[in-house]
Every structure is written in structure tokens, then in C-alpha cells.
């Protein structure tokens, strides 16, 4: 998959969508179509930049995307703000899935609300401005106590200095 921004600069354009393309040589690509399109009237109406989840992370393994409960999964940055990374509005982390063939273009299903938000009661200062890219791994050994580990980065303002900072966070899911 790849993410498409439809503007030329940081504030023009609507935002991100996620498309799929294929290549035989990594130099020449054929666009196949969208997998996360704009959704008018939803929390993520202008931003839907996706990142496929559950790759096989075994060293020397297949690196193929694994299924869970018969579905492929993808997290994405979503929001209603327009422009590059919605500079005037927060981004949140959404979740999408499909039971279909991930090598063909088709719209993936999405949740009606984000799975990670600046409004979450346990959000720390560095998560309260916006949230960015996320990646989910399936740790079948539950090294951190849960099988699903999401790494994500987020931004916020320090409560004492008011300086903007970004951090990488870890979220766990059972």
C-alpha cells in the first residue's frame, strides 16, 4: 500500500488516502486503486493514511501480512482536518480490516471511532496534540504481556515549558 496526499503544499488539498500499487521491479508501478477513501461525515473524513498491520516479523521469514480472525488489519492516521498531516486539526489512530484479497483494490471496512485519541482519559501530555503513524505487530509469545503491540508516535505540548515534543509510544491489546 501507499499513502497519497492530494495537495501540493502543506495547507492545500484535502488530506491522505491509502491506495495499492504493484511492481515487478520496484521501479515501475501500476496503481490498482484505493483501499481507504475519504468518508464524508465521519471522524476521518479528510485523513485516511494507512499502515498494514501484523507482518510476519520472523528474521528471515516471509514478512507477509498475517490474518487474525480471518481478516487482514491496518491502522491509519485519520481526522477531519485538511492539509498535510492536518496541521490545523488533530489526527487520531483508526483501525480498518478486510476479509478480501489484499492484492486487489477494494474499500476496507473501518471502525466508527478511533482506537487511539488525544481525548483518551489516559493520554499523556505528549499524546494530546496529535497522533501520527502506527505499526501493529503480533507477538505470539506475549513478551510484553499481550499478543498485539502497537508502536505509534504522537505530539503534544509539555505542561511546564509549553514546548512541542513528540514521542514514540507502545500500546498493548489482548
Predicted regions and their residues:
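Carbohydrate-active catalytic/glycan-binding domains of CAZyme proteins
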Residues: 1-174
Amino acid at each position: 500500500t501507499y499513502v497519497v496526499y492530494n495537495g501540493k503544499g502543506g495547507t492545500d488539498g484535502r488530506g491522505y488516502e491509502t491506495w495499492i500499487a504493484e511492481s515487478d521491479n520496484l521501479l515501475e508501478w501500476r496503481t490498482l486503486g484505493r483501499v481507504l477513501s475519504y468518508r464524508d461525515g465521519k471522524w476521518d473524513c479528510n485523513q485516511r493514511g494507512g499502515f498494514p498491520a501484523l507482518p510476519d516479523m520472523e528474521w528471515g521469514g516471509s514478512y507477509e501480512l498475517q490474518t487474525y480472525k480471518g481478516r487482514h488489519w491496518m491502522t491509519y492516521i485519520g481526522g477531519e482536518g485538511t492539509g498535510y498531516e492536518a496541521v490545523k486539526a488533530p489526527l487520531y489512530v483508526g483501525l480498518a480490516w478486510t476479509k478480501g484479497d489484499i492484492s486487489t483494490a477494494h474499500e476496507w471496512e473501518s471502525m466508527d471511532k478511533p482506537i487511539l485519541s488525544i481525548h483518551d482519559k489516559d493520554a499523556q501530555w505528549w499524546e494530546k496534540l496529535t497522533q501520527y503513524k502506527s505499526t501493529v505487530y503480533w507477538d505470539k509469545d506475549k513478551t510484553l504481556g499481550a499478543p498485539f503491540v502497537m508502536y505509534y508516535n504522537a505530539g503534544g505540548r509539555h505542561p511546564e515549558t509549553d514546548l512541542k515534543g513528540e514521542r514514540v509510544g507502545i500500546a498493548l491489546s489482548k
